[in-house]
Each structure stands twice: as structure tokens, then as C-alpha cells.
Amino acid sequence: MPQRYNKKTRYASKSRKKRRKIWWFKKKAVYLQAKLEIMKESELHFAPMWDLNPLWNTLTEGEKEQLAKDVELVHYAKNEIIHHDGEESEYVWMLLRGKVRIYKEGIGQRQQIIRLLKPYDIFGYRACTVNEPYNSSASAFEACTVYRLEREKFNKLIQGNGALCYQVMLMMAKDLAFSEIQTVNLTQKHIRGRLAESLLLLLKNYGYEEDGKTLAMLLPREDLANMSNMTTSNAIRTLSQFAQEGLLALDGKHIRILDEKALEKISRLG
């Protein structure tokens, strides 16, 4: 039988389309506003790379002059992708301000956060050094500014400066050691030990706010779970247990550390 014309259904369909359109424009407006804010910051002056990370102190004056010409200042909005896992390596980055997450996607597109970077950290260099695709993804955890250097120019510096090459080897060795420790932490420790380890890692990277108790990092529970190799519900439940035991206090995304030594003990015992 032919379908009868239904005016209510037609109006409902139009209403849904209108709501979707409004939602899309709002989302676009938020994104553009974020881009506008970080574009305004492009006028800010950032010190040369060699004044921010000791890796570059090994450069000669001539190499520093060339690096200043070659490096680019780039801004990323919150959650904007910097590079994808499997993408051809093109740049080495150094974070200037903001925070960046390095992660891999597993089954069901579940993210495993490998590292959270702080200002002046260098990333993307391993893939560029061996001319391989990136083996992880990087995205802006919050609006951030970076220096980036093309792969060929980075490799040319390494090949022409033995001291710089040695410093890159040291940096790679430290990152490898960190990865080995994290592998043990995430596979052998129990849930409490893994979460305590993640909280201590955030504390080491970002420190406290002015009150000397609150972590200077607003991390959603999902991201904290992805750092700790557990489900979001387990992360929420374990945080609540820590709060009940007086180890920390929760206020939305704010986490106040009340007993750092107890967290260290839980992390150590696993």
C-alpha cells in the first residue's frame, strides 16, 4: 500500500535536521574561537630552542643561525591532531606551551596514552631519525604551541654534529627505559598500583598548583583510565577508594594529593 502523507513526520524530520545543523555550527564556532585565540598568541615571543632544551646546546653558532631560519612556530587547538600513527614522519617537534598526549589506538579505537608531554619536551624524533612512519599518534591535550623542524634538516644536524648525535642517543635511551618501566607497571601491577603510578607521573611532569596540593593537570577520568590501562569505571571507583582512605580529595576534575607517600607505597607494592 502507498504510504500516506504524514505532516507530523515531515515536521519532525525537518526539526531533527535543523537541530543537527545548529549543533554543527556551534561546534564549528567553538573550534574557530579556539583557533582565533591561539592565533592571537602567535605574536608572543618564544626563546630560541637552544635556550629551552639542553639538547640544542651542542650546536655551533653557525648551526644555531641556520636552525633559527629552518624552525617553524605552529599552533594547535585543543584535541587537534599533530600527527597520526602510521603517517610518514615529516617533522620533529618541541613543545613550547600547553600539553600534548602521545597515544596508540587499540581494539574498538580505545586509546592507550603512552606519554603526556610538558613544555620543552621533544617528540617525533625517533621516527625521523630512522626515516620510518610515526608509530603512535600525537594530539593537543589543550591549546598548544610548538616548534617544528623538517626531518631532513634534523637529520642533517645529527650527521654533521657528533655531540648532538650523542645527546639524541641519550634522549632515546631515556625514553626506551621509561617505556620498559611503563610496560611492567601496566601489565604486572594491580589496578590500585597502576592508578597510583599514573597520579605520581602526573605530579612529576606538571607539579602542584599554588596551594601545593592540587595537581596542575585537569585530566578527564577517561584519559586517566587510558593512562593506567583500565576501564573508566575502574578508574572512577579506585579514585573514590583513594579519597575514602584519605589519600586524595576530589573536586570535579581537580585532584588534591593529601598523602603522597602512601601513593608511592601503593605504586611500589603494585
Regions found by a protein language model. Give the residues of each.
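Cyclic-nucleotide recognition modules
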Residues: 63, 115-177, 181
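Cyclic nucleotide-binding regulatory domains
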Residues: 55, 80-143
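Phosphate-/nucleic-acid-contacting segments
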Residues: 202-270
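Short, positively charged and aromatic/hydrophobic N-terminal segments
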Residues: 5, 21, 26, 30-31, ...
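Polybasic "coupling" helices that flank or enter modular domains
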Residues: 141, 159-229
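Cyclic nucleotide-binding regulatory module and flanking cytosolic helices
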Residues: 39-78, 122-123, 127-129
